């Protein structure tokens, strides 16, 4: 939800037009995260305020506004900081006044872009209004800009990092922030807590080291030659504020030279920095990135990037590694496809192979998951395996639950992260939790992860995004390696999660002789899964015809499955809801008689999953019950069915029962896609939805 993009050039000459185009291009790469408005800010001409553009709607409107303005785009800058943002409304309706950047005052002395939600913004606003601050928007973000100005006005000589520390100490909630100020030209500060923020580094010269030292504050007390500090702001310790704007004594900052970004002569060289919510807008310019940790404060000044900590405690490592992204720009482009969704559906044969690459030896029928090896014995001795996820990721967990129970003989629980957080259930130290998330930044899953860690359980991450919060905070994990997924509705990430979890079940049962034959059967099935997915994709034309002829005018749908295919029914219903805006319900076939049959008549659109597995007799019984009440379901099956004239049958290839859901979900992906296209919906960015759900 929301997207931040910032661009800083130092000793690299760029004109204002180039900078604005870079911002717009970055925001377009972040569109998939979900948003309803956008904005950006660049420096004005000498002596002028910042130039800001804000528009409600898609980024192309912002781009048109910039093109139509009379701003001098040829003005050149040798040192410049620009910030931009796509907003998902949480406080205040989508409107230009509520768009980011938010400003501190009419002269924009401080401007801020922000992802997340500040939970104490009402208290902050009340105190700042009592100090004469006049608010112009409904956003929580404006509090940050006004608090920065308040501290600046009441603290003579404060440097940007010290000011930022004083601001960030007062904030509660989840956030990623970029702050720019006319009082600190050519500088920008950034921080994160519970919301992702990445720094890209582009330099023609080789970096001296591949890390940045974390600069911890020196304790103010007891340092020789330093006066005992006093509270900088009377309001900080005012009892009337009930502890809000706390009276923490400021730490003295220790500023060292940033080793990575200086030349042999000890001075910074030409360099560019890119701040972003994820890697997609950065890889066009550089693959060298650094992932900020919670409560890091990144400060760019005179070409140097410094990372400070808000407090001495916490923070883990004393360095932040500059990593190389294994991602190509082509992976985030649509190519010759009309939409990202159909591109990602068609990429599934390759994405599934990437998930298995280097992990499965099909000749010897061995599965190796190096990320779990150190914890293998602990996992095997677990009291319970508890999967925690949201949305599509939750469905992938439901899909593999029977297989884990069958192969590991360990009790398995699947939890919705939001419900888990609300209940705060008992957690035992010998439990193993498996957190599944495409982005690795899902807010509810992160809260559940924190609760799990506090209770001493082992946490495993299964994510698609390398360097994400879940991948860093869990003890170990498995990357699904599906590649960037831009469409809000998940397709290839779902099937890659499915396969990654199947690999985990196979890996955890490697020592079970009694299950050897079953394991070999599944591994042989995995060897053919890419080809069978490709074969299933050949059904595209038939599924398109079914969507147009039978479902285009329907506003509801029942999807019925059983066993391994209950998860397929849930995921299929979610796809139909997300993309075609048709109310759909995934139903467990065994629950038909407990209420759902009341909805069945000859006008109710129904899709039934009838795979040729051990549950087929029961699934067929459900079909007969539906047919007896006038229902005429579309059937998805891998079995040759006779005497069903007049029924639409989508026949998919047959594979091992526990893998059949990978093939059976593809017709739903295509069905929802064509319904959305024919109805004229925005396929890649459905209304009201976001790719990365980073707030509760």
UniProtKB/Swiss-Prot annotation:
Residues 375-514, 547-686 form the SIS domain. It holds the Pfam family GATase_6. Pathway: Nucleotide-sugar biosynthesis; UDP-N-acetyl-alpha-D-glucosamine biosynthesis; alpha-D-glucosamine 6-phosphate from D-fructose 6-phosphate: step 1/1. One of its GO terms (cellular component) is cytosol. PROSITE patterns: GATASE_TYPE_2 (PS51278), SIS (PS51464). One of its GO terms (biological process) is UDP-N-acetylglucosamine biosynthetic process. Its EC number is 2.6.1.16. It catalyses: D-fructose 6-phosphate + L-glutamine = D-glucosamine 6-phosphate + L-glutamate. CDD domains: GFAT, SIS_GlmS_GlmD_1, SIS_GlmS_GlmD_2. Keywords: Aminotransferase, Glutamine amidotransferase, Repeat, Transferase. One of its GO terms (molecular function) is carbohydrate derivative binding. Disulfide bonds: none annotated. Residues 2-303 form the Glutamine amidotransferase type-2 domain. Involved in amino sugar synthesis (formation of chitin, supplies the amino sugars of asparagine-linked oligosaccharides of glycoproteins). This is Probable glutamine--fructose-6-phosphate aminotransferase [isomerizing]. It comes from Schizosaccharomyces pombe (strain 972 / ATCC 24843) (Fission yeast). The lineage of its organism: Eukaryota, Fungi, Dikarya, Ascomycota, Taphrinomycotina.
